[in-house]
Amino acid sequence: MAAVVALGANVLSAKSIICDIEGTTTSISFVKDTLFPYALKHVEGYLKNNWNEEATKTVVTALREQAEEDKKAEVEGVVPIPTGDSEDIIPEIVKNVEWQMSLDRKTGSLKTLQGLVWAKGYKDGSIKGHVYDDVQKAFEQWTENGRKIYIYSSGSVDAQKLLFEHSEQGDLLKYLSGHYDTKIGAKREKESYTSILKNIESSPEEALFLTDVYAEAKAAKEAGLNVVLLDRPGNSELSEEERKDFPVIATFSDLSFAAETKEENGGATNGKRKIEETNDDVAEEDKAQVYPNKK
């Protein structure tokens, strides 16, 4: 069992929460053991059944261009993708995808094709996005307390949305205010976090980044963000030195954000208590202003 961790006031008062996915909201094994094998198994069928779709044509062109770049760069083992009829091209695309995935490459064209294949699986119910048991409750509480939640992952924005829309705990997209992938920058570069802050119009002091990767945490800290590391089951072991640099938690329930509302005298009180006090004081006909969703 993880030891109780003291979290600083800046962490617990953060208004913008930026979450990684793998190892943070979602098991690393889900991507490795479910999503990747599904893409490998179904990519050929997807291409055959959707060959004339514009999205397919676009991604095939992108894969071919990537293969040409790899060939020029003398990347070992590259599988070229020819032009011609689908029956000639599809087997080579499959080989190219298998080669890239065997190297754990994250090229844009590969991620796009994976996303197209996964979309079909999510929508027909073959895939349900894994999220840890504490995620839905935490997302709900954080948003109710006035926090905004953003996702920053190496997976494409489309793939992120599919995972959270079709999660094991239902549609979680309603809790999310934005999504970012590596188009905004690499996750181990300080500038990426600065760009996200600018995009969401947040100061670094009011932002919190949650991740399981020390190098990402370090980059975010260099950009001025508050950072907490996640120690989930199956994650890479954090060293003692890494644990000294950042607070480490095992679950989102270890983060307790207090909902605060300003009183007329300038003080602050817990949001739940404030509503209860107000409810006692207002006339019956005015209660809809306190509980706007109640008739």
Swiss-Prot record:
Belongs to the HAD-like hydrolase superfamily. MasA/MtnC family. Bifunctional enzyme that catalyzes the enolization of 2,3-diketo-5-methylthiopentyl-1-phosphate (DK-MTP-1-P) into the intermediate 2-hydroxy-3-keto-5-methylthiopentenyl-1-phosphate (HK-MTPenyl-1-P), which is then dephosphorylated to form the acireductone 1,2-dihydroxy-3-keto-5-methylthiopentene (DHK-MTPene). Pathway: Amino-acid biosynthesis; L-methionine biosynthesis via salvage pathway; L-methionine from S-methyl-5-thio-alpha-D-ribose 1-phosphate: step 3/6; Amino-acid biosynthesis; L-methionine biosynthesis via salvage pathway; L-methionine from S-methyl-5-thio-alpha-D-ribose 1-phosphate: step 4/6. GO terms for molecular function: acireductone synthase activity; magnesium ion binding. Gene3D superfamilies: 1.10.720.60, HAD superfamily/HAD-like (3.40.50.1000). One of its GO terms (cellular component) is nucleus. One of its GO terms (biological process) is L-methionine salvage from methylthioadenosine. Disulfide bonds: none annotated. It comes from Anopheles gambiae. Its cofactor is Mg(2+). Its EC number is 3.1.3.77. Monomer. This is Enolase-phosphatase E1. It catalyses: 5-methylsulfanyl-2,3-dioxopentyl phosphate + H2O = 1,2-dihydroxy-5-(methylsulfanyl)pent-1-en-3-one + phosphate. Keywords: Amino-acid biosynthesis, Cytoplasm, Hydrolase, Magnesium, Metal-binding, Methionine biosynthesis, Nucleus. Residues 260-295 are annotated as: Disordered. Substrate binds at S153, S154, K187. Binds 1 Mg(2+) ion per subunit. Mg(2+) binds at D20, E22, D212. It is found in: Cytoplasm; Nucleus.
